Structures are given as structure tokens and as C-alpha cells.
Amino acid sequence: HKVVQVQGKVIPATRWWGLDITCDSVDIGLIDFWTNGFFSNPQGRAYGNLKVFGQEQQVWVLADVLGKNTQLTVPQLGSTFYFSDTIHMDSTSIRIPKLDVYDAVGNKGTFEGIITHDKFTNFKYDLNAHVDKMLVLNLPPDPQALFYGKVYGTGDLNIHGDDYNCKIAVNAKTEDKSKFYLSVNTASIATSSSFIDFVSPDTS
């Protein structure tokens, strides 16, 4: 069984070269080098065609890759998401069409986004998800962490940033069995912010 089949051509006179790569059940973990920072622990198998060609110092990539039984973890949230669908790649971006995703306990949501890059450096990403009672935060207790806990949510999530900064915007409500812990230091700082108020539940 051939996991990867490669065919290529080189034209010395013009310094042009091209590779046609067919993937058949390639370990998705190979992408960890490029996705580390916004995704971690990628797992699953990849199928599809990848064209890589270039001339002089220029390199272009075109690919449509089907990921089967794929799982990706968002390290900032500690949550792992699962899907089987096709991802599109070219020389400047990785495009994820709207696809169905599942959490570790089988709850369903949707996910889409785009990751841009400069020859696979200087990554920027804009990722969106709609979740329905999904496990969106799953961080173990850590006295050094700003927050931790296990949170199930329904609503919308946006993660955007680059190699150096990450911003997470959430418009969602928590569901049953959610437990969220905020460190004392973080709570003190947050209380002094004009846009955050901590309130006690009305027990009257």
C-alpha cells in the first residue's frame, strides 16, 4: 500500500519544477510543525492531491485534502474538536469551509475559517465556530493559570490573531454541568476594569 505517491518534472532551461503528490491515509500529525500555536495535537488521516511547483525562489502550493477522523485541540481553551471534511490550501492560505464538528462527548457544532501565511511563515488566522451545548473550555486546575474549568456552551466563538497574539471573542451562554474558576489575582484586576462587573445571584 502506497501512503504517498510522488510524480515530478524539472525543466532546467527555465529552472521550473513541479511535483504532483497523492496522499492516501497520511498521518495528519505531520502538520503540527505549521499549526502549533493555534492548533495542537493534530490527529487523523489525510487523503487527496497536492501540487507543489516553483521557479527560482518562488514556490506555489495547491491542494484539496480530505481529513478523516480528524481531531484538533485549541490550546488556549483546552478543547478538542473532531471532524471529517475537506480543507483547501494554496500558496497564501488554508481555507476551512463550514463543516460539522463534534466535541469529546459527541455534541455538534459548525466551524469555518481562514489561515493566511507568507510561504508558511507569519501566520494569521480568523476562525469561527457556532456551538450547541458543546464542551468549549476544558482546562485542568492550575494555580498559575488565569482561569480554568470545564464549560459547556451554546453560541458563537471567534479566534483570531497571529504568531504573537491571540484574541478570543465569545457570545454564548453556559449550559448545565459547567464549572469555571477565575484566579483571585485575575478577579481583582478584572473588578477594577470599567467593562466588567461581578454580581451575586438574586436569592430573594
What role is predicted for each listed range?
Residues 1, 97-104:
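Short beta-strand segments that buttress and anchor functional surface loops
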Residues 1-95, 112-204:
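Membrane-proximal interfacial segments on either side of biological membranes
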